[in-house]
Amino acid sequence: MNAPHPASAALTQTLAARPTLAELEARDAFAERHIGPSPDEQAAMLATLGYASRAALIDAVIPPAIRRQDGMPLGEFTQPLTEEAALAKLRGIAGQNRVVRSLIGQGYYGTHTPGVILRNILENPAWYTAYTPYQPEISQGRLEAMLNFQQMVMDLTAMDIANASMLDEATAAAEAMTLLQRVGKHPSNVFFVADDVLPQTLDVVRTRAEPIGVQVVTGPAADAAKHNAFGVLLQYPGTGGALLGGLSTYQALTDAVHAAGGLVVAAADLLALTLLAAPGEWGADVVIGNTQRFGVPFGFGGPHAGYMAVRDAFKRSMPGRLVGVTVDAQGNPAYRLALQTREQHIRREKATSNICTAQVLLGVMASMYAVYHGPQGLKRIAQRVHRLTATLAAGLRQIGYTLEAGAFFDTLTVATGPRTANLHIAAQAHGFNLRQIDDGRLGVSLDETVTRAEVVALWEIFAHAAHAGAPDFDQVEAGIADAFPASLARQSAYLTHPVFNAHHSEHEMLRYLRSLADKDLALDRTMIPLGSCTMKLNATAEMLPVTWPEFANIHPFAPADQTVGYREMIDQLEQMLCAATGYAAVSLQPNAGSQGEYAGLLIIHAYHASRGESHRDVCLIPSSAHGTNPASAQMAGMKVVVVACDERGNVDLADLEKKAAEHSANLAAIMITYPSTHGVFEEGVKRVCEIVHSHGGQVYVDGANMNAMVGTAAPGHFGGDVSHLNLHKTFCIPHGGGGPGVGPVAVGAHLAPFLPGRAASGEDASQNIGAVSAAPFGSASILPISWMYIAMMGAAGLTAATEAAILSANYVARRLSPYYPVLYTGAHGLVAHECILDIRPLQKESGISNEDIAKRLMDFGFHAPTMSFPVPGTLMIEPTESEPKVELDRFIDAMIAIRGEVDQVISGAFDREDNPLKHAPHTAQVVMADDWSHRYTREQAAYPVASLRTRKYWPPVGRADNVYGDRNLFCACVPMSEYAQD
């Protein structure tokens, strides 16, 4: 037998050594891009912890009793798709949607998003990956943008103070109702809603009113003062377009309500307010609404930034975030979140609201729309919309149709009689969605995107149905006058601050946006190790579909045959989330985690009521819980009973047994977070569920920490009945600097009939809890982000991400434990996906606080960890799975260097008051000033580690003075003179 030729043998060896095609294709896996540490880096991290494999670590961290063994089947998405394949699949699904010109109105309007805003805000990770600006010194850019939003709302509504966005108009109305009940002196429990208020707003108000004993009464706006109500809600203009009359009509109406002891909420269209007298000018006490038409697409209902503005007397009762102006350590103006002591994470069940995340990114877009167009530009847009609407109205009258309102802004209600259904169909056939109000009326709402040709096309549709001819556009338009009383025309100035009058060219706008982004720290610059926040990668491929027209340009009340793709994507995402949680059903309607919590508790309440046990109203909440838990329980009409935690941070089972037995007859639920808020997997979680179930209660598992469980444990399997998820944490929707968020509620099969629904859509609402958000699917246009993430990761990738998150947290904890005590650990001295460093012993010895360390981290180019939650005087760190080892090590090295500085304070090498920690952060202005009086060097201040010489972030302001800011509350744009240098 002949020996093989040497060349042939070499070829065989070469072929055997080369990777297979399958191996080459596997290297394009998205999971490898999403998970930061490489396999080799993970091995090194595991070696630091003393574990041979990731599986061995997970076995030691997660209690065996709750480990899932099914591999988390995801159906067709069990195997991951590449980025390209996932985008192609989703593009095919989106293609089933049909983009039609929607003139439905009902609070949602077509709008042109200026390209400079689309590209440099909505599509810019410097804006969308930032967190809520709790650390003001590294958030000055978005704080300024949020202050612009507040100024815009205050000016247009003529109110004293506005907050930095609400979740949507409907929840803003519900919050306004409870605000009026808190601040008013009226003994009544009646809240009057005018019958021309948006239907979805009425739905949400009714949902919010029922558990707190408020009676909602509806009727004509003119009857508002006749019902002995503590509060009245008016729509301005009404849903059907009507204005009630002149300025005196509105003033007389509010005067009558005030004389009866009530207060008035106006739901106002901001674009209309550029032409119409502002609600603050005719006596409204609170003004709410939506800013969607200021450059934010329909998005099938969201996300959009709602707003609320109030009279000065009510500012401390206003929900949501509030940006104020203070001074920094050098006396320069600085922005910060003001009046934080009224928020849920501090006030708990006594908070003004449970709202946490709002809609900052969308609020920034809306404010920049106003900055870009300025007051004159906005007025021109409004005048054009009104002129076209008045022209359309005159033409319809010529054709022979009757309009219900003589005074209007942009919406017409047309009496169409028996032609209604056919007209509705004909309009759709010609590319227009109209609002069918009932069997005899159609609504038409115009917006800035509507053209002259489309007005003519509408005339032709209506004329054909009436067997008449369409009028001539130029002839009709030539005779048009304003379609509202002259006395209602706005006389007051608005948007007079220079910021709204200086950035109207694209170059100016582009550079302004860049200057703001440069002031901030977001994930595009550095890791954000905030505990309980899961600041993970928001991959570009996940973000791309958000602005596709097939997702962006769909009205939330478009006909079902135009939203087939949306429904398919939503159905698939719901199934994915059911698989991840172990529950039977999911609703994606809640547009924030706080709303998901609230919905979950309402579901529990409805379930008990369906069994004749509506008296069950006690909610057990561990003392370590996030503040939204007790705030949500209070909103749901439940009584909060606190359960103690033991010295290891776990629920005290003995105290739980005692409290559950004590309240057995009235026990509705327990709210627990898992892994716990203390960052550990409690061994006794199944026992907690058993105890509560044995006393007839339901188990609410807060899903804020789901990033530690996906693929490894499922709340629906270990005893949970209901959970909310934070898609803006676990499933990669970005935080947007404080919103948007999505807070789906997931339930067991026995609770599925009670998931949120809405009467406005005609759905059977006999069992569901009603609507908790304005749109049927909440913030629908950002749901593709989570769909993409899950589709690209697959079951194994999602599980690997969870394991990597746990590995990274334990790596950080282990490396920092010689320098800072890790407050809580579980079995084997390990943590879950986050760890809490106890700074209190160091503070006692050195005088250096957790705030000093947080501010000093800014000099190192890092966002601080979570401060003083859930334990005062601590720092909670959550690195997530997405940070590479080099970034983890950079953060660890910074923390070790800071500990070295603390030691120098203790030893006396640094003065206890004049040291780099007490004066952090250090601005470039301070470091480069001629005068340097500190007892440490400029280099120690600015470059505490050598790596900063090639990667230096300069905080734009020094430490913000919180006390000054709250004592001298100022929540409007700062006069430019304040920035003048002496």
UniProtKB/Swiss-Prot annotation:
Domain of life, source organism: Bacteria
EC numbers: 1.4.4.2
GO molecular function: glycine binding; glycine dehydrogenase (decarboxylating) activity; pyridoxal phosphate binding
Class in the EC hierarchy, top level: oxidoreductase
Record's subunit section: The glycine cleavage system is composed of four proteins: P, T, L and H.
Assigned protein family: Belongs to the GcvP family.
Protein name: Glycine dehydrogenase (decarboxylating)
Gene from which this protein is expressed: gcvP
